[in-house]
UniProtKB/Swiss-Prot annotation:
The keyword Amino-acid biosynthesis applies. This is Tryptophan synthase beta chain. The beta subunit is responsible for the synthesis of L-tryptophan from indole and L-serine. The gene is trpB. It comes from the Bacteria. Keywords: Amino-acid biosynthesis, Aromatic amino acid biosynthesis, Lyase, Pyridoxal phosphate, Tryptophan biosynthesis. Belongs to the TrpB family.
Amino acid sequence: MTQTNFRSGPDANGLFGSFGGRYVAETLMPLVLDLNREYEAAKADPEFIKEMAYFQRDYVGRPNPLYFAERLTEFCGGAKIYFKREELNHTGAHKINNCIGQVLLAKRMGKKRLIAETGAGMHGVATATVAARFGLPCVIYMGATDIERQQANVFRMRLLGAEIVPVTSGTGTLKDAMNEALRDWVTNVDDTFYLIGTVAGPHPYPAMVRDFQAIIGKETKEQMLEKEGRLPDSLVACVGGGSNAMGLFHPFLDDASVEIIGVEAGGHGVSTDKHAASLNGGVPGVLHGNRTYLLQDGDGQITDAHSISAGLDYPGIGPEHAFLHEVKRVEYVSITDDEALDAFHQCCLLEGIIPALETAHALAEAMKRATNLRDDHLMVVCLSGRGDKDMQTVMNHMAAAEHTQEQLV
């Protein structure tokens, strides 16, 4: 892989440079290899492609708009800001793009049961949605901490027929849910399809999820050429595991004129131990079947991640992001909880759009940058999801802030 072609990975072993690979139990290796064969065959099958296009159009509601955020642009006083409106998809986020692709693959492989992990609940909702549509039983592993802060999505999953398994090990968040889902998969390899929600896990998952999400960037490229007659100057997206970001970024990686920025969750600050910024505060290691950047202590043990956003509260990042960081094609920065909350409120007041707290991290970075850019600079922000699920978190934070203010007075 040369640095003039950033889109050619992974190699036959699932590696992006030194990142990725297949670090799985011996019992899972035949299944992972079989999944890779089936995926490669499906990609080349016109019927599979046709069926996926049908569901993307008539079920998900694609293409979604590329929207000029006029009032936010005026407020920042610099770059012209566009939103790629993934929150308008069926289920309210980008997650459904990947779930449609994987459930069609599961059906093609004759699998009878779906399992998934979820943090913010949006991947769980999207998985439960496709399971209902295709008549498959579905088990969702979700950390007990995340269940408490995402009650609305838990109820949605149950309405859709999914069984929710609370995970109390560790910190009860996304990392722990993924551990339990992998244990289930090892036990039920013959009839179960593990529908991973981000660009992580053993090969072929990082590449497969990226490919299913790349419709975001493909549409953005077409829509920007139609609206402005040229490519955007910059792209901004939040990064937890990193599937919405990779979906937006990948079609543009070989367009050298396009600056690409991934935004990690800075929590209370990367200099503290309360953040989820794996690239800005981590080191390479192996977790959940792939080698990538991870939050680790001096003994190589995975440390707890923190973010106000459940969907970014993960101590790792997709291996392709790790590669793009090392070769410096993408710039990765971090935004704190407080900065994300400020951007959340500004987006609500200026654009009448309530974004997910994950998305608010990207908005905060976009607003910082836009102010210092020319008014002919075209910036695209991936509006990865809507904020309905985050109402309780925001309410709690506002109540706590008011209480603190009262004490100061």
